[in-house]
Amino acid sequence: MKRIKVLLISVLVVSAAAMAFIVPSCRKSEVSHPKVIVIGFDGMDPRLCQRLMDAGKLPHLDQMRRAGGFRPLGTSIPPQSPVAWASFITGANPGVHGIFDFIHRDPKKQCKPYYSAAKTEGGDEGWDVGDHKLPLTFWPFNHEAPQTVLRRGGTPFWDYLDEAGVPIQVYDLPANYPPSESSHGHMCCLAGMGVPDLLGGYGTYQFFSEETFRVRQEGGGIHNPVILEGNRADLRLTGPKNTYLKKPKASTIPFQLYRHPTEAAARIEIQDRTVALRQGEWSDWIKVEFELGMPSFLPNSHVSGICRFFLQEVRPSFKLYITPINIDPTDPGEQQITEPPEFIDDIAAKLGLFYTAGFQEDHAALTNEVFTDAQFRDQAGHVLEERMNLLDFALDKYEDGLLFFYFSSTDLQAHMFWWDSEEKHPIRSPQEADAYHQAIVDLYTKMDSVVGDIVERYGDEATILVMSDHGFCNFRRQFNLNTWLRENGYLQPKDCRSILNPRKGKMADWEQTRAFGLGLNGLYVNLRDRERDGIVNESDRDALLSEISEKLLAVRDPLTNQPVVATVYRSEEVYTGPFASDAPDLIIGYHRGYRAAWATTLGNVDDEVISDNTSAWSADHCIAADQVPGVVFSNKPIRRTAPSLIDMAPTLLKAFGVTKPDSMVGGSLYEPQAVAEAANP
């Protein structure tokens, strides 16, 4: 597994004997190779593509359909982005790569949740110096520092291409942070979804407002009060924790805010920068440097980040939004976000500063009502503009071999703006729902132009593939699996409010609880000798799962009398491989329009089993896999009748004459699919 050091320092040690061997960045092959270009549009939906092609609004994709082919692309079980992209990367089911949900649980700690794609492992204890504990990473101490570890198992398809000498470029692909190593020097990669911001989260904005009266944190953001005295306020920007302290504490940077006395404008002074903004304006990227205090006999450590300021409102209530603090691409420090590490220097030299965090469109700011719809669309537009610049860089660098480029816009904008039915929208009027769904249509037409530019540039000299990991649908109603389990006697006691959070109320009684829900699609049996407090015998597991599955499939929405659950998957029936035993016992596949309730994803219990989704996050895909397939287009004829994600890696290997490994069970898109194989993708 790939490991990177987190916030290490060299403690005044210089080793004259130290030498480094550096594999050349994206080493060119001495022979020419076929050209294969893959564009990944996260969440691009086949139904919407078909409708827009029929209406003449996606001419370039339609041309690909007619010249080569277009198919729905079978997605992963469940159809969550890290699961799906890991299946694309390995050409295998989740039992091989070990990612089953955004959220996994640690059975040794009963149901403690953790992020499925990466983890930070603690290092050695270090050297006690007053309030500090310092890792001595040099000889003779050789302390191990904390390290971020990629959890994804299996072998990525590009390792086989790298070994064969094929040049590979991969940009922003999810489920690959820290980026996997290139053993032969033919691959360069910029990591995407999973890259943290400088605070260690996955997108923590900071919001300063006169309407906020105390510092508070909510999912995705920190809210800070603004107290103006004579149109001036002294504020602090929160940075990374100083992990050299025995009790880690967040670092901060002071900055001053000056509101114009008469105009809708303000000035911000932070470190050596002055930022002047009018209401509604965004700043450029601003570099900020956080100081991490060290013992007095050592120099302090410094961490560089970047952020943008948005002056949301000057009067009557002052409001300032600051983006999550991203890793500085010109000075990433110990945070490796590219492979090889120096590849980020090439990108930054061309593009300057840009979003590096894995989640770039700030959906949390819209969900938490910090952004309006229009403001979120503007911010998402900044992200897309940067991605277009990055694509230009990638195409200019590309000569032959494999180029993979990923766009998040088609997913994260769709989560907030998709609405393709006459049903009542959770938060918008019918007119607003139509208007913002039109924003998704407009986005698809922009992506169609991207495809057109690439086809025009390379024509028939390259194999060009356009793909997505899953489709999309409305998220109208939410189903609280834990509430249902409680009401049906599987989760105890009858007044249980959470399996994790005592602040919610009565906790689960594990001596009586037989099953619980965690994550977006997972249900776990409280199995003896597996869960720390397990009570269900292995001999009773099968009957219990059959009983729960039958009851879930019978659940109907009292509002519409529609079935809520379309499919209940048994893990042993859909997963094989070394990690299969880590999977949930059941994977709940919801019907379109339904999804797991927000509360149930982290083990909480609502009052109602089924309720309206009232979040701005009004569309989703974490449902039954057959209801939200992705797309695949090609400029070469597709001969596979029922392609799926696990066919993509074999397709790419075949294009370069590389034999697929036994772990890949799919086949090339350009070869016929056997009848039996098509029935069991």
Predicted regions and their residues:
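Secreted, luminal/periplasmic, and some membrane-associated catalytic domains
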Residues: 32-34, 41, 55-56, 66-72, ...
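Short amphipathic alpha-helices and their capping/turn segments at secondary-structure boundaries
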Residues: 332-346, 389-404
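A long, amphipathic alpha-helix that forms part
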Residues: 27-30, 377-403, 413, 419-466, ...
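Low-complexity, glycine/alanine/valine/leucine- and proline-rich hydrophobic stretches
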Residues: 593-642
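N-terminal Sec-pathway targeting helices
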Residues: 1-12
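Second-shell loop/turn segments in exported
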Residues: 47-51, 146-147, 638
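Bacterial Sec-dependent signal peptides at the C-terminal "C-region" and cleavage site
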Residues: 15-32
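A solvent-exposed, charged loop/short amphipathic helix patch at secondary-structure junctions
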Residues: 127-141, 419-438, 606-613
